[in-house]
């Protein structure tokens, strides 16, 4: 079984290589990119998806923009860079890692404003690679922290894809699953199908199956049943943005899963790289929620599944109230309620 990586970097050819996640699980194909415009399209069209992976991809996209930026003086170079940063940031408004990575790249350019512009371009190349490598380490550490909350024989429910395909490697929510397999644990994963784009069945189930992990796909409306049957000991999901009070935006349907978990007394864990925590966003009400193409709901695989012309509401995300969350697990440690106080402490370390 082959290891599936969402993001690859070809250092010799200066190209970003992305797994086309829109055609999984039927085809495994990679697409090469070397322009900011191409990277924008890859994020907008969900060739690449998942907040950490989007952030890494955007960093490379801004480097590609820097490559063709004016070189006469820093002011002109940085003006162009800022314009392209705003352009890339508009591709997916909910994932905070996107704006975080772009700000890191902008700051790196400003730190080196007294250097030759050609040298700054090389520095930005290395910074994008550093963000990529850091994401791998973050994901592994999140897994190491999460696995301390689990035990051999555990039954896990996950929603959408916060796996290796949503990050540079390991995933966030799936990281403890890969580590548990390495330890030889006997455990079972239930993967919500995740309507309407089916990331749970086409992505999470695929990557776990390819890794030899015991995974079972269920439709979203089966989650209550498997919980009631005692098959689930923990719910682990990723996130796209966490507000200062712990409210968490994640793929549509996550809030419903959290309500079920609370009802059945099952712990709900959020796997979260610290770049996904937005201390400047006070509550979930302040998180922008992307609305997507209605045809994601009304048609699938070229077949209409609803009357043509029917009204459709298709938010890509919902917000899980902090009251429903047992713990937020980051690379810096496990955060328990009260989240408003304890999340802030992460950034004081």
UniProtKB/Swiss-Prot annotation:
Keywords for this protein: Carbohydrate metabolism, Isomerase
Enzyme category, top tier: isomerase
Catalytic activity as recorded in UniProt: 5-deoxy-alpha-D-ribose 1-phosphate = 5-deoxy-D-ribulose 1-phosphate
EC number(s) given by UniProt: 5.3.1.-
InterPro entries: Deoxyribose1P_isomerase_DrdI, IF-2B-related, IF-M1Pi, IF_2B-like_C, Initiation_fac_2B_a/b/d, M1Pi_N, NagB/RpiA_transferase-like
Record-annotated active site: 240 (proton donor)
Residues marked Transition state stabilizer (site): 160
Pathway: Carbohydrate degradation
A single MF term (Gene Ontology): S-methyl-5-thioribose-1-phosphate isomerase activity
Gene3D superfamilies: translation initiation factor eif-2b, domain 1 (1.20.120.420), Translation initiation factor eif-2b, domain 2 (3.40.50.10470)
Biological process annotations from GO: L-methionine salvage from methylthioadenosine; pentose catabolic process
Binding site for substrate: 49-51, 92, 199, 250-251
UniProt keyword Isomerase, yes or no: yes
Domain of life: Bacteria
Reported function: Catalyzes the isomerization of 5-deoxy-alpha-D-ribose 1-phosphate to 5-deoxy-D-ribulose 1-phosphate, as part of a 5-deoxyribose salvage pathway that recycles this toxic radical SAM enzyme by-product to mainstream metabolites.
Annotated family: Belongs to the EIF-2B alpha/beta/delta subunits family. DrdI subfamily.
Name of protein: 5-deoxyribose 1-phosphate isomerase
Upper taxonomic lineage: Bacteria, Bacillati, Bacillota, Clostridia, Eubacteriales
């Amino acid at each position: 079984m082959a290891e599936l990586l969402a993001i690859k970097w070809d250092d010799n050819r200066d190209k970003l290589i992305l797994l086309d996640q829109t055609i999984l699980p039927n085809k495994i194909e990679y697409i090469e990119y070397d322009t900011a415009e191409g990277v924008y399209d890859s994020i907008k069209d969900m060739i690449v998806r998942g907040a950490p992976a989007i952030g890494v991809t955007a960093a490379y996209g801004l480097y590609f923009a820097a490559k063709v930026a004016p070189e006469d003086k820093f002011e002109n170079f940085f003006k162009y860079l800022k314009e392209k940063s705003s352009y890339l940031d508009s591709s997916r408004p909910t994932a905070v890692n996107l704006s975080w990575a772009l700000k890191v790249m902008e700051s790196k350019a400003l730190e080196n404003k007294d250097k030759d512009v050609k040298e700054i371009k090389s520095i930005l190349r290395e910074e994008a690679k550093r963000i990529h490598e850091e994401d791998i380490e973050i994901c592994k550490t999140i897994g190491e922290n999460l696995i301390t909350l689990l035990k051999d024989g555990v039954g896990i429910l996950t929603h959408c894809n916060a796996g290796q395909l949503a990050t540079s490697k390991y995933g966030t929510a799936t990281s403890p699953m890969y580590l548990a397999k390495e330890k030889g644990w006997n455990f079972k994963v239930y993967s919500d199908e995740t309507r309407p784009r089916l990331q749970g069945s086409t992505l999470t189930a695929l990557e776990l199956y390819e890794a030899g992990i015991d995974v079972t796909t269920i439709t979203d409306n089966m989650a209550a049943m498997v919980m009631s049957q005692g098959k689930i000991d923990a719910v682990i999901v990723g996130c796209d943005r966490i507000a200062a009070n712990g409210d968490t935006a994640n793929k549509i349907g996550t809030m419903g899963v959290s309500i079920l978990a609370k009802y059945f007394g099952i712990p709900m864990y959020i796997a979260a790289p610290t770049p996904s925590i937005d201390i400047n966003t006070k509550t979930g009400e302040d998180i922008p929620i992307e609305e997507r193409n209605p045809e994601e709901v009304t048609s699938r695989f070229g077949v209409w599944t609803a009357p043509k012309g029917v009204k459709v509401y298709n938010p890509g995300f919902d917000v899980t109230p902090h009251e429903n969350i047992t713990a937020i697990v980051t690379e810096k440690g496990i955060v328990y309620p009260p989240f408003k106080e304890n999340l802030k402490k992460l950034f004081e370390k």
